[in-house]
């Protein structure tokens, strides 16, 4: 019989920024209690995974039922990054002071009064802006394809914000530790982490911060270096719609670059300054760090897909990372996708993610990984790992029932 369960636990605070976490960590599991369980499999959703919770539950059930595993979804810190079909997990689109400042600047270009501009009047102001721009284009006073750029902010639920990577990765290990405490018979099973885009990045990052709790990684298009547009994108020079912020919404004569709420900034006098060490710890393409990881566990199987033409996360960084892992003795399979590998079924395009849904990714790669891991005992043994990053040392370690980050000068 297929069993579905949900748990809420305490996890980690934001150690980097000194912010106390107020939300609980939720994770959901699915398993068939009539079958012999082969592994613990974490299905890691990327940006937008919260949009359809029913769909999320259904393909977790599919994986648990078809592959005899405990399938786990962790609703990690800042999991709620988009509008959701379940209000509890929905983000709110809003306009911050920075957004309103830019909108006002654009409106004044067209002599539109701004004395009534506020969060609840932005839409009506933009409708008026669209009317004026339509008229100017009809009069050939604006190029027909000209667009203005506006900005908006996504406010995640549960009082969360975009920390990017570290807290979300720690959440998965805390969920694992809670899971095996509740179900001790699962403790020695192989542990597999996988997902696409940000989910793939988190799977790779988990292998970095807690390699002794990882047996396999299934990655599709995870970034080997942190994409800064998702962290401090608001402060970066604008280059294109696709690389500015988290996403954009298209209007008739303007588009809206959307940014997830974050505390990170490049303002050096801020307590939330995103410094070099914060970048280094999130970077997977770091030879010295990969050597330290390999000293803790070389028995991780890596399977990765990446488009050679990926416009968001350059393939050459992933290629270099996987080459180093292979030299260090890891079992690595990197599938670099070019136009000859597009089959219209599994691989649909050369865009970011290659058009591969998570369900299809696991359906193809999970049986092969389970076969390789058959009979492996993966013991839950406490450990720690230290990564020098500039003037800081990031220490990830087990502390009783918890997994924690400590930063030392």
Where are these regions (language model features)?
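Short substrate-entry loop that stabilizes the transition state in hydrolases
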Residues: 46-55, 63-66, 79-82, 226-227, ...
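Serine-hydrolase catalytic core
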Residues: 35, 245-409
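Hydrolase active-site cap/lid region
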Residues: 208-276
């Amino acid at each position: 019989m297929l069993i579905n369960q949900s748990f809420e636990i305490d996890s980690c605070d934001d150690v980097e920024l000194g912010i106390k976490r107020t939300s609980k960590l939720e994770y959901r599991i699915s398993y068939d209690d009539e079958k012999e369980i082969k592994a613990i499999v974490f299905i890691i959703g990327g940006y937008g995974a919260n949009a359809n919770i029913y769909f999320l539950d259904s393909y977790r059930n599919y994986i648990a039922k078809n592959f005899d595993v405990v399938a786990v979804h962790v609703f990690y810190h800042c999991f709620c990054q988009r509008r959701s079909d379940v209000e509890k997990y929905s983000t709110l689109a809003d306009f911050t002071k920075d957004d309103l400042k830019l909108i006002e600047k654009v409106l004044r270009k067209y002599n539109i009064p701004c004395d009534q501009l506020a969060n609840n009047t932005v839409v009506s102001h933009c409708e008026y802006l669209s009317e004026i721009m339509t008229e100017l284009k009809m009069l050939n006073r604006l190029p027909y394809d000209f667009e203005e750029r506006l900005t908006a902010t996504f406010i995640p639920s549960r009082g969360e914000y975009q920390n990017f990577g570290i807290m979300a990765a720690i959440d998965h290990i805390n969920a694992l530790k809670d899971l095996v405490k509740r179900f001790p018979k699962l403790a020695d099973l192989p542990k597999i982490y996988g997902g696409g885009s940000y989910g793939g990045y988190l799977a790779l990052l988990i292998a970095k911060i807690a390699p002794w709790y990882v047996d396999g990684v299934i990655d599709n298009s995870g970034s080997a270096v942190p994409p800064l547009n998702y962290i401090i994108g608001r402060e970066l020079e604008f280059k294109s719609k696709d690389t500015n912020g988290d996403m954009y919404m298209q209007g008739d004569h303007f588009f809206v670059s959307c940014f997830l709420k974050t505390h990170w900034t490049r303002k050096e006098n801020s307590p939330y300054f995103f410094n070099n060490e914060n970048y280094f710890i999130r970077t997977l393409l770091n030879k010295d760090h990969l050597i330290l990881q390999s000293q803790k566990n070389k028995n991780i199987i890596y399977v990765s897909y990446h488009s050679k033409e990926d416009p968001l996360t350059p393939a050459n960084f992933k290629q270099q990372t996987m080459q180093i892992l292979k030299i260090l003795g890891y079992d690595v399979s990197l599938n670099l996708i070019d136009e000859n590998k597009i089959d219209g079924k599994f691989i649909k395009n050369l865009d970011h993610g290659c058009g591969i849904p998570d369900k299809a990714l696991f359906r193809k790669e999970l049986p092969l990984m389970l076969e390789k891991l058959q009979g492996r005992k993966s013991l839950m043994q406490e450990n720690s790992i230290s990564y020098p990053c500039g003037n800081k040392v990031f220490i990830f370690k087990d502390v009783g029932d918890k997994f924690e980050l400590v930063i030392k000068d």
